[in-house]
Amino acid sequence: MRNTKASKFSDRHLGLIEEAQVEILNALGHADINDFISSVVPEEILDAQPPDELLPKALNEIEALEELRSIAKKNQIKRSLIGLGYYGTYTPAVIQRHVFENPAWYTSYTPYQAEIAQGRLEALFNFQTLITELTGLPIANASLLDEGTAAAEAMSLSFAVNKQTKARKFIVDDQVLPQTLAVLKTRAEPLELDIEVVNLTDLVINETVFGLLIQLPGKSGQLWDPSSLIAQAHEFNALVTVAIDPLAQVLIAPMGQLGVDIAIGSSQRFGVPIGFGGPHAAFFAIKEEYKRLVPGRLVGQSIDSKGHSALRLALQTREQHIRRDKATSNICTAQALLATIASFYAVYHGPHGLEEIAKNIIYLRSQLELYLKEFGYTFAPDCRFDTLEIHCLEAPEIHRLSILSGFNLRILPLGASIEKSKGFAVSFDELSTTKELYKLCKIFADVKDKNFEPRENTNFNFKESLTSLPLRTTPWLKQQVFNNYRTETELMRYIQKLASRDFSLVNGMIPLGSCTMKLNATAELLPITWKEFSSIHPFVPSDQAKGYGYLSEQLEGWLCALTGFDGVSLQPNAGSQGEFAGLLVIRAWHKAINQADRNICLIPKSAHGTNPASAVMAGFKVVAVECDEYGNIDFEDLVLKVETYSSELGALMITYPSTHGVFEPNIRQICDQVHLHGGQVYLDGANLNAQVGLCRPGAFGADVCHLNLHKTFCIPHGGGGPGIGPIAVAKHLVAFLPSKNFHASDNNAAIGAISASPLGSASILPISWMYIRMMGADGLRQASSLAILSANYIANKLDPYFQVLFKAPNGKVAHECILDLRSIKRITGIEVDDVAKRLMDYGFHAPTISWPVAGTLMIEPTESESFEEINRFCEAMISIRSEIDAIESGITDLSNNPLRLAPHTMETVTAEIWDRPYTRQQAAFPLKDQFMNKFWPAVSRIDNAFGDRNLVCSCSTLEELSET
């Protein structure tokens, strides 16, 4: 019999062993964990027991994997040649093993602390360089969520550029992908922008148009030269966006040369599995003059204090965490890990390898055309890349035979059943072979009662198939990084070199407040590599995706049970998109009950910047609510605001526990006040890790809540994505959840598509399924309890050294605590950034700095860290306090000290000349245990201002930059 206690997953997920829990509880003055939790979570919302009857009993790792495998087998693996933005591709094994499956890459956080993030910053810099080379535009960001979202961001940017005019029309090519059009319509409606879908051959642009979106190649496969149309649009100051296929762009002239303003697309074809629609890294490239309007992260080059080249996130003043309701976008989490994979895919293949893949696709498509003509099929003689559409009476039989032979073809018209099909389309991809072509041709010939004789075209010239637009004529991707690593040995070492320059959970605790950097267990991640999940196209017939249907339905039910809500949508593929979706649901409900004028959204001043940015995107006007000395919403100010805006009140956005790290005792009264005046309560689930199994937002008054599966439910952060931000809603809002059908909807009340895939980032949902399945109700409650216990232990231990800024009246915090360093700055000049950089020398990633209050550190240990690691962090902070005291007492110089000069690199401490008033050991090994396990910052402190003044977002080579 298996030893179930020894194999209990929660024992491996939870960091505090029983003896440590007892020691902490004694230090905090509590008899047991239940007594402690009762002192933290308000009694009126605390559940006595987790919702056992609605959640499964915990399974161990082996049992959970077996159960999930049985679910995965409900999906049917076939070769999908459907296209429409999703294609078969091969992730080189060296990239799968050393990046995709490597916790050094997938457990790191967004690279805000750049000195210990040079590896992933370089990988993302390579991605940006790849995109600028593909598009011919000078600025590219470090990824967006998907192609549909990228198109919506391009529309918003185009409107922002032309906001002073009366233009409100956005022209969309009728060849645009259906999911992109669906996302555009959703985004345009609350902003009162007009979307007009047209055949571009008939288009006449005038002063009412602010932007234009072209799809090249179009969904039917056509390629054409848009130069004259671009020139026409520019006559009326309209911005032109082109959605491009990156493999097609390998061969055709860069769009920047044709005059486009913005180029977008998906990098999925560059080694990222289809995964039922996501996650995939979109790209966004733009002309120089619009660089300060670019959405998402932007990696730029700067210099460190030694004058060495260094990378960091550039132009951050554009972003929502600073600009709030005036931000260029609400995008926070993007798709960093997938962009990293795409960049390594380009490094692996190099320019010539990518060209050969693209040429083979064209060859197969051209051969298919020749054979189909011989069989008697007819089609327009257009210039095409990978796709061929055929309309014929035999379509239903062709689809039936294709499926029997293991192929999915695109059903025409889109959204039709096989029985009502009027045609088919074939989209070739990297995995396509002549063998597959011949199998398909045999089907097409048999249906027409024709003979098929395979033959090879030895005289094929791809240029003859691309005659309708200019081709790429000059060498590209000449940078060393895309040409140096032709052997696996060299590529493996390059990947490892970059990984070693990054701090991740492999190296130590990442105590970022509001980020929940908990364990991402290997067993949770293993299933996402299974073909049954990774190879399924999002538009396959529903009977081929029953596994995804079963998994998503089960996961939605569990999330409803844990939150106390009645319905869940898994479609939003980031927390920011969950916010947007939730607010649109509220807005749709108000419209449905004839109260469309309710457009005021109340938001506490402590809220995360995505909240006001999302509210504006959803068509709301933001009104701020004050906070009190304990970090709670100022109830008197809330009452004043709801009464002032009673007839216009649409929603209150509130984070719980608050962004100040406390459980607000009157949360029910807050919700009641909003409801009394006709509003709805949107609860930001960023801090749900303090609630799971303890209390349920739907039970204490919230109407909508988004959940960050990449925080609370163990999807790794990946250095800045992927993420999933599903929304859970109360019963009266269920009908308004996002539509899953991009072609037609049976539910007219549903808001439109939020992401470019019906199930969002579907392929990583198994991670959260595994976490819940292995933890069970009791394990989840224990996780929340220990996360809160660890945070209170840190607050209690560090309180004599640093002021804990916000506490409940009984001295307790929630799952995170905020240390106030502002008085230290006034006395010594030492800033919070100095402490953050000094923590790198101690072997830690810094907590969240200067948010939600400037000059503070917000610490969240999570439930996964051990007592030893938590104590090591506390020891580091206490040691740093002693270094500050030495400055305050005059023992240490105000400017020449370990904090001001942190972080200390290996180059610095091994230099022949050491002219600092502290020892090399104090600089690099301030804790005794570091001699055996030292993480070195890759660069000295980076000059952020220099990087923004001299913006460089792509380059010839990093090596060449280091010489300049």
From Swiss-Prot:
Keywords: Oxidoreductase, Pyridoxal phosphate. One of its GO terms (molecular function) is glycine binding. Signal peptide: none annotated. Its EC number is 1.4.4.2. Pfam families: GcvP2_C (PF21478), GDC-P (PF02347). GO terms for cellular component: cytosol; glycine cleavage complex. The modification N6-(pyridoxal phosphate)lysine is found at K711. InterPro entries: GcvP, GDC-P_C, GDC-P_N, GDC_P, PyrdxlP-dep_Trfase, PyrdxlP-dep_Trfase_major, PyrdxlP-dep_Trfase_small. Its cofactor is pyridoxal 5'-phosphate. It catalyses: N(6)-[(R)-lipoyl]-L-lysyl-[glycine-cleavage complex H protein] + glycine + H(+) = N(6)-[(R)-S(8)-aminomethyldihydrolipoyl]-L-lysyl-[glycine-cleavage complex H protein] + CO2. GO terms for biological process: glycine decarboxylation via glycine cleavage system. The keyword NADP does not apply. Belongs to the GcvP family. The glycine cleavage system is composed of four proteins: P, T, L and H. The glycine cleavage system catalyzes the degradation of glycine. The P protein binds the alpha-amino group of glycine through its pyridoxal phosphate cofactor; CO(2) is released and the remaining methylamine moiety is then transferred to the lipoamide cofactor of the H protein. This is Glycine dehydrogenase (decarboxylating).
